[in-house]
Each structure stands twice: as C-alpha cells, then as structure tokens.
C-alpha cells in the first residue's frame, strides 16, 4: 500500500502525463496505482522496476519484450517525479536497466518513442547511449494538438 500511495502521489502530475499515452491515468489515483502494481506482481514481471529513493517510489522503468517476429526487441518506458528531473537519475536508471535487460534476456535491441517536444527525455536517451533512428511526422495527438514522434534505440552490440 505504501508503494501505491507514493506511486500515485508522484505520478499524478500533468507534466508527466502530457508526454504519455492517454491510457496513463490523469488524475493518477491510489486505486489506479494499486491496480498497476497488482498487475505487475500477478504476472511476475521482472522487467518492470520501481525507482525508489529512501524507500519512496519516485518513478518507474520498464521494458516490454515484443512478440512474434519482433521478439528480440524491447520497448522502453519510464517516468520520474518532476522534482527529480535534471539530476541524472533517469539517465543512470536507463543506462543500468538497459544493460540488465541485455545481460538477462534474449533482447538485442531496445527502443523508446518520444514526443517531439519532450527534450528532457531525448537528452536522457542520448546520454544513455541511445541513437535517434526514426522521426514520425504528425504521429501523436494529445489534448487536441498534433506532435511528431522520435524513435531512439540501442543495440546490444553497441
């Protein structure tokens, strides 16, 4: 329960939500946090981790392994409480978690997709060794506005 309270407290932030798919709840309630954490625990997901500071959840990071012909690829997602932005925490989390996934799974390629106006996330990925490999014009609609989307990736061999 403590994790759910902390998770909801930090995830319930417009400046986080505005860069996520609409399925990311807004407002982010304790009930939604319990449901999310419960789903991860029920499926024994080892590729979803909470980012904690002094036993308080301040974000999360996950890689969803793709299926079928894309099964060697993983989709990276993450968020961090706004008060911790710009401190290198997420860059280090992405760097370490990427290595963990490469060392402990069959994944050989990890990719992330970023809104074109999310400069902070682009910097995180670039500092963690990800390379921009795609640019999709008019790919996202959020709050009635259309945005481009960038795709970054890192290969196990690099």
Where are these regions (language model features)?
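Amphipathic alpha-helical interaction segments
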Residues: 18, 44-47
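Residue-level marker of structural boundaries
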Residues: 13-16, 25, 42, 157
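Acyl-donor (CoA/ACP) binding surface of acyl/acetyltransferases
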Residues: 1-5, 10-14, 48-158
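Short loop/turn motifs at secondary-structure junctions and domain boundaries
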Residues: 39-45, 130
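Conserved GNAT-fold acetyl-CoA-binding loop/helix
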Residues: 15-37
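Short, P/G- and charge-enriched loop/turn segments at secondary-structure junctions
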Residues: 36-39, 139
């Amino acid at each position: 329960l403590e994790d759910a309270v902390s998770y909801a407290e930090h995830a319930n932030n417009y400046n986080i939500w505005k860069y996520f798919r609409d399925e990311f709840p807004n407002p982010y309630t304790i009930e939604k946090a319990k449901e999310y954490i419960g789903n991860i625990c029920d499926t024994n997901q080892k590729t979803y981790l909470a980012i904690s500071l002094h036993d308080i959840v301040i974000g999360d990071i996950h890689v969803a392994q793709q299926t079928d012909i894309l099964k060697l690829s993983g989709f990276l997602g993450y968020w961090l409480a706004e008060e911790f932005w710009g401190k290198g925490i997420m860059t280090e989390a992405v760097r370490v978690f990427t290595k963990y996934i490469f060392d402990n799974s069959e994944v050989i390629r990890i990719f992330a997709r970023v809104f074109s106006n999310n400069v902070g996330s682009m910097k995180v990925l670039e500092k963690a060794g990800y390379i921009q490999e795609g640019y999709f014009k008019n790919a996202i609609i959020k709050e009635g506005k259309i945005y481009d989307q960038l795709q970054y990736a890192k290969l196990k061999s690099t």
